[in-house]
Amino acid sequence: MTDSKPSVSVIIPTYNCETYIAETINSVLNQTFKDVELIIVDDGSTDRTRQIVASYGGDVRLLTQLYSGVCVARNHGIREAAGQYICLMDHDDYWFPDKLALQVDEMKRRPETGLVYSTFLWWFPDTHGVFPPPESFTGHMGEIGIDEEFSGWIYHLLLLDCWVLTSAALIRAEVFDKCGVFDESLPYSEDWDLWLRISREYPFIKLKRPLTLYRQHPNQGNRLARAIDYRTELLTKAASKWGLCSPDGRCLTRARFKKNMARYHMEFGLKNLVAGNVELANRSFLKSWITSPARVKNLAYIPAALLGWRPKW
């Protein structure tokens, strides 16, 4: 890698995000760490997103493609990236100014690390749909330091939940050569799938300080009912392939894994029950009980659903 190449490549896939894309771009350009290339991959936007990005001129490299989905757009950016480290940022999130500086410093101090991530803050709109300014969160920044519990070899912990927010991560570029990129066949949980693969080959570091704002919308996709439970499919596949232990020997007990899977089956069932998919919901409630028979209460949802009960969310 020559000196002319950037230290960090920031890749932002975007689609119809004219309302928020400028704030996201500005948060990257305002980083205290300046050795950065910013790549925006426009995934066939039909609003003014592309024009807004183009207005930044040489500060941003704009790539365009026909609408293909976020995984394809991210992988497009990864192929074009020249940096030693790569960040993948969602088009409506926000970085605090020291995000890259703190993460790059940690990467340099720990060359064996494949991924550095941080805590993040949920960013909700008020009752009028207005998001509070990022400056209003400065009182919630907390201490600088490493969260040891969620650092190191964390594969076994990733079998419980997707602890890594995509926008909050910094990844060593060589990781993609060894572990692959985003699985374009997955419509959901594609980030979790990648983190699981990386966690088999590299230790992670988690910084305690929140460095990213994660913007939330009322109809956000991760809250909607789906026909397939991608979470349980992903975790079942991972456990079957790699077991329940991290490379350093730390393990998740089978009982805890099953209890967690039962919880996911139940959550999937409740989402589908709210959406009116009673048959699918009841199958999920039954799977939850079969996975963890101690959760007898999950069986009670089946007759309740048939009698017309719905959770009030």
Predicted regions and their residues:
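Short aromatic/hydrophobic "clamp" motif used to bind/position activated sugar donors
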Residues: 86
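N-proximal low-complexity "stem/linker" segments adjacent to membrane-targeting elements
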Residues: 1-29
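Catalytic core of nucleotide-sugar-dependent glycosyltransferases
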Residues: 202, 210-218, 223-248, 274-291
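Conserved donor NDP-sugar-binding/catalytic core segment of glycosyltransferases
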Residues: 98-137
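Acidic helix N-cap motif at the loop->helix transition within catalytic regions
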Residues: 19-22, 45-55, 94, 98
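Glycine-rich, basic loop-to-helix element that forms the pyrophosphate-binding segment
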Residues: 65-81, 91, 102, 153
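A conserved acidic beta->alpha catalytic loop
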Residues: 27, 34, 42-51, 67-68, ...
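Conserved nucleotide-sugar donor-binding catalytic segment
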Residues: 79, 118, 137-233
